């Protein structure tokens, strides 16, 4: 199975993109990610909104983690998808200031790969969370509360 990920770096856009704006404002899609803080700031600077932006941290908590802290992308992906994702943290263990300082510039290959991996991982986690909820929620037409009692 193949998945395509579009990386649109709107910080470098020289003019507003009407198609992109319509896409992120569409009620047909939800956009899921981990920690929406910077996304919301960047969208605001670009004078854009994304009404269906989902912060996965508010929909899933890793069992046994500190209840007062939000889980990271790696923690969530390791718990929801596969423990293999714990290696992502080791691979991206770089100088945080240097790593984060270039997001407003043209992205190098490492950052583009990270963005694509982040996007796919967020998609897969949210898909699994939605699936889990769909299987756990009772069917409104079934169950003992819907059985007619003969009197």
Where are these regions (language model features)?
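Conserved DEDDh/DEDDy metal-dependent 3′-5′ exonuclease domain
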Residues: 1-128
